[in-house]
Amino acid sequence: MKKQYLYIVIVWALLAGCGSQRIFFQQQPKVNMRSNLLSESEAPIGSAKREYRHSNSNWGVEYSGEQWVRNMSKPIRITEGLANRHLSVTPSHGRYYDRGKDRWKWQRPELFCTTEDLFTQTIVISYLIPMLENAGATVFTSRERDWQRNEVVIDNDDRTKQPQYTETNGHRTWHDAGTTGFASRRREYTNGENPFLEGTVRVARTSNRKNQSLITYKPNIPKEGRYAVYVSYATLPNSIDDAEYIVYHKGRKTVFHVNQKMGGGTWVYLGTFGFEQGCSQRNCVVVTNVSDKNGVVTSDAIRFGGGMGNIQRAGMTSGLPRCLEGSRYNAQWSGAPTSVYNAKEGQDDYTDDINTRSRMTNWLAGGSCYVPGLSGLKVPIELSLAVHSDAGYHNDYSSVFGTLTICTTEYHDGVLNSGISRNHSKNFATSLLHDSQRDLSNKFGSWTARKVYDRNYSESRLPEVPSAILETLSHQSFPDMKYGQDPNFKFVFARSIYKTILRFVANMHNTSYVVQPLAPTNFNIRFIDKNKVRLSWNPVNDPQESSAKPTSYMLYTSLSGGDFDNGQPVRGNSCQMELQPEILYNFRVTAVNKGGESFPTEQLSAVCHEGATRTIMIVNGFHRLSSPAIHETASEQGFDMNADPGVTYGPTAGWCGAQTAFDKSNIGVISSSGLGFSGNELQGKFIAGNDFNYTTTHAEAIMSAGKYNVASCSSTAVENGVVNLDNYYCVDLLLGLEKDDGYSFVPYKTFSKNMQRLLTEYTRSGGRLLVSGSYIASDMTSESERNFLNNVLKVDYNGETPSRNYTNITGMGTSFDIYRTINEDHYATTSPDVLHPVGSAFCALLYGDGRGASIAYDGRDYKSFVMGFPFECIKSHSKRNAVMRGILSFLMKN
């Protein structure tokens, strides 16, 4: 009877929740831990001069050296955030090789268009890590973080890369460092092969700028896009803490200092940058030996892009981008010893992957002041967080299952490697649970907080620093996933996690903290002279955080297709700038305080055309972020991606495929008929979302006309009275996928009552109006809204959408294709509106089935051109420009 009871308890524990750590391990032998009470002569292993005793700190010791990686080009000084803090944050699971079934598979089922292996990335990679980095932290994640399938590695050992790898010697020469390093000897690696033990490393003594020595790594980028940059080097006894790396990205220059006293022999993340296709000096990384420190700089391989999985199991790789694989395989590619990722000797990748996440953290942190009793790379990682989703549901089909956190205090006599109590982990887990409940309830109504588990789970037991597992919500519960798939919910949840980490770290070190601000609003650019513009914006108050007030701002600029610079500080909420003629300027703004930096505003653009007498104002009205369409009846529930795939914040790696099973009665059934079951047609694809940069596409097209100045603004600036449309001869209102879908947590009405009034007044005064968007007519359903469509936009709508088989549009003496299906390059207009002319208006463009795509009105009172699809969804750059020139020729004529 006792055995039966024990069996039931264990099975229940294994089945509850996500089960990522639901493997119970035999308790390891207890060991004596190093005390954090150090004598004058005693110091942690590897401490050198980087640590000092701190009696007011919960740690009892502080790291006081240079941060692992510092962006020296960014003019922001963070004093009450997470600067010089090193954190480990990893999304759960990932693709793994199942030896018993001899195939690669997800660790969790495909439900509600995703799987936990994909879903938690969309919180951690898109929101949480950027927030932590904006607060100044260096963040390690054991899974590949770059959503980029391409990868280029340049290494000194591969002479075929010449001239992509070049050395320039000054007073000090580059030579072999006499230690092992990275070499790419093969396309794929079998179990146990370590690329960081197969090559060599270059080294040079430090010098001044005048006598510098350089190594240039110039990749041949296969496709223009954003690529993570990783560097590698060796840590030697006389390594310096400010090795200089210069990243040239689309001609822009960003300088980093890397502390080479730690982290040698693995990939070290610098940042993610825009690179142009091909091989040029505009896109490269330069390592110098410049430093005022007396020592050496080492340099090994440099990697551009996350790449495809290259770890072979039973003769096959996963066939997916590395970022979708489990930590086990990334650890091998990153040079970790087999003890980190291969304890089961290739017999059980599932268990090895679970343990790899924590062992990677310990390997990096070993020898630092926070993990002094282990050998490792001496990176002072001080906190570990595993972000998961759980399993479970309520039979009423409507109640949220909610959030759970996990810690482990009863292990190794209740202390961590440095000697501090494991109760700090419990404090962290408790704060995560209650803080998230408070923040989510304040924003979305009552949120369910389940409990704090103090149990034996791998990712809360193995880390030798304070740690917790956060089970965000249940991926098996549709009421939970209605929240979870909404990008606005993800932002709020991630911000709550970031704030908890901020407060916890500050408490551990007995320091003050300030919460980073929210992004500014009402961003706008207006001409105040023939070649001078004023940029202005307003702060956004965070009612939940009194400290989250901006004290200054950062203005980021890019020129004519180049990458953005590292920002210029602005004290107030406006600035002036002189524009050079015929150059496309793009701008973003962030809010800044002592705690860090906000997310950016939308991207706005400006062009000064020499001799221009008229200015066109581009109004960005596309701010929508949403889950896929929600389908919910008495008997069915789920996401209907065919009706509307939703809009993510930038690209996403979170979709596995469309949901195919909606029957509520099959809740909890693990089969193709089970509620939420989804396909796999989208796995491995990075689906484009809202990049918030479409004013640039419109400005480029207007610029091709060679006649007009271009200004731009957010639609909020128009609706709040900051920008007066009557000041502009022509207005280009882009609405993209904007619509009030009825299920998103933020309403995104195409034409609010206020905007209807403003556009009515603008046209009555003789304005010239261009409007484009997928739902400009279908989103207007009331009688008054239909009257606005008829009387102002001169269009009518009968509920029609062209077949998705039709991607071609004709008219205006040309034809072109638009994005109709979701893809990796640009968001898609899956359901554009079919428009009908009213009165004297006429069809200017037709869909492939002959129905109206655009309606033009050439009145004596005003002129308008209304498109039932987003202008920026025209695929061809040259066609976009030609169509815009034709539209402007029509609108701007007297």
Predicted regions and their residues:
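Active-site-adjacent mobile loop/cap segments within catalytic or ligand-binding domains
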Residues: Q281-C284, A301-G309, S368, L383-S384, ...
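Short beta-strand-plus-loop segments that form exposed binding edges in beta-rich domains
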Residues: V285-V296
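Active-site microenvironments of hydrolase-like enzyme catalytic domains
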Residues: L324-R422, D454-Q476
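Pro/Thr/Ser/Gly-rich low-complexity, intrinsically disordered linker/stalk tracts
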Residues: F504-S547, G596-R614
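Beta-strand-rich modules
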Residues: Q576-E597
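Helical hinge/lid and interdomain linker segments adjacent to catalytic or ligand-binding clefts
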Residues: W655-N787
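A glycine-rich, often tryptophan-bearing local segment used as a flexible ligand/cofactor-contacting loop or short
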Residues: L737-L846, S878-K879, V883
